Amino acid sequence: MKVAYPNIFVVLIGFYGLFFLTVKLRDSAWGLLSTFALTGFMGYTLGPILDRYLGMPNGGEVVSSAFAMTALVFVGLSAYVLTTRKDMSFLGGFITAGFFVLLGASLAGLFFEVSGLQLAISAGFVLFSSVCILYQTSEIIHGGERNYIMATISLYVSIYNLFVSLLQIFGIMSSDD
């Protein structure tokens, strides 16, 4: 079954609108409802992506591999931070720089047809999301992030990005093109 992916502008407006709404409402009961709306919307946008990969000849393996790897990375990184209790706040600068590098590479990918760029961007997002998970988990256990709504959405977005990036990598590596 082919599920149409929503218009990119609808996705961007929906995500950023719900994200900023959740940040604004984070200290009220409405923030919880906004969190459910944001995560539900992100799940809605994930449906057509999964449909595309499941339509590939080995799509089930690609999706299950990306899911398993995402779970292993998240549990492994979180366990590392929880057991070592290391303060990962020093990663803030790397996260900022990584964001701008990935933004620039993504924009370049829209305009230039460079072989392997999509794979490199996806690998960069895997690294970026992993560093964000380390940083956010450390912030949560060291009291830097005390708001459960912000902790939830920051980790959820990192896990979502990690999963989608791994899907892209496994999809590229398993295609015959």
Regions found by a protein language model. Name each.
Residues 1-177:
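A hydrophobic alpha-helical transmembrane-helix feature that marks the membrane cores
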